[in-house]
Amino acid sequence: MLERIKDSFTHSIQTKIDAAEALPESIEKAAEMMVQCLLGGNKILACGNGGSAGDAQHFSAELLNRYEIERPPLPAIALTTDTSTITAIGNDYSYDEIFSKQILALGQPGDILLAISTSGNSGNVIKAMEAALSRDMTIVALTGKDGGAMAGLMGTNDVEVRVPSNVTARIQEVHLLVIHCLCDNIDRTLFPQDDQA
């Protein structure tokens, strides 16, 4: 088991090295989109399932509270947190609509949807993207593997950050790092620091 544990660290490190080569430009573009969204008085909605739901909530918490610097709260909503709404929609309609119906109610032109799915094939996240597009929102998608069906929904103004891995755990680990990179870029662009390199 010790070797298996060490292998997990090694594979995680290698996936991050591969991601460091493949992803910086798309992360930078996504962060720039988010900055412009926030400067325009808009908000970021985030969704995902399981660990990706946790990532959506993590991102929202970093914006609403703070990441690493003291600054005013920034508008972000995780669509994964309201159990009454989620269970009502799931019960009365379908699980595939738990995010899309919220987006149709809350999303405005100029808002961004942060759509997170390791496979790119989560039905409710795909429906969320379709709803966001119908509301003239832009999309930042965090995916992995081959991008799945989500990759096919990306428009010219949208950004996909696709982790170069087929292993769900490794993709999730990089998604968290991507979220931290987005938060850091947003903070450092909107609120430059004297010690900024």
From Swiss-Prot:
Keywords: Carbohydrate metabolism, Cytoplasm, Isomerase, Metal-binding, Zinc. Substrate binds at residues 49-51, 62, 91-92, 117-119, 122, 172. GO terms for molecular function: carbohydrate derivative binding; D-sedoheptulose 7-phosphate isomerase activity; zinc ion binding. It comes from the Bacteria. It catalyses: 2 D-sedoheptulose 7-phosphate = D-glycero-alpha-D-manno-heptose 7-phosphate + D-glycero-beta-D-manno-heptose 7-phosphate. Its cofactor is Zn(2+). It is an enzyme of class 5 (isomerase). It is found in: Cytoplasm. Pfam families: SIS_2 (PF13580). CDD domains: SIS_GmhA. GO terms for biological process: carbohydrate metabolic process; D-glycero-D-manno-heptose 7-phosphate biosynthetic process. Zn(2+) binds at residues 58, 62, 172, 180. GO terms for cellular component: cytoplasm. Residues 34-196 form the SIS domain. Pathway: Carbohydrate biosynthesis; D-glycero-D-manno-heptose 7-phosphate biosynthesis; D-glycero-alpha-D-manno-heptose 7-phosphate and D-glycero-beta-D-manno-heptose 7-phosphate from sedoheptulose 7-phosphate: step 1/1. Its EC number is 5.3.1.28. Binds 1 zinc ion per subunit. Catalyzes the isomerization of sedoheptulose 7-phosphate in D-glycero-D-manno-heptose 7-phosphate. Homotetramer. The reaction produces a racemic mixture of D-glycero-alpha-D-manno-heptose 7-phosphate and D-glycero-beta-D-manno-heptose 7-phosphate. Belongs to the SIS family. GmhA subfamily. This is Phosphoheptose isomerase.
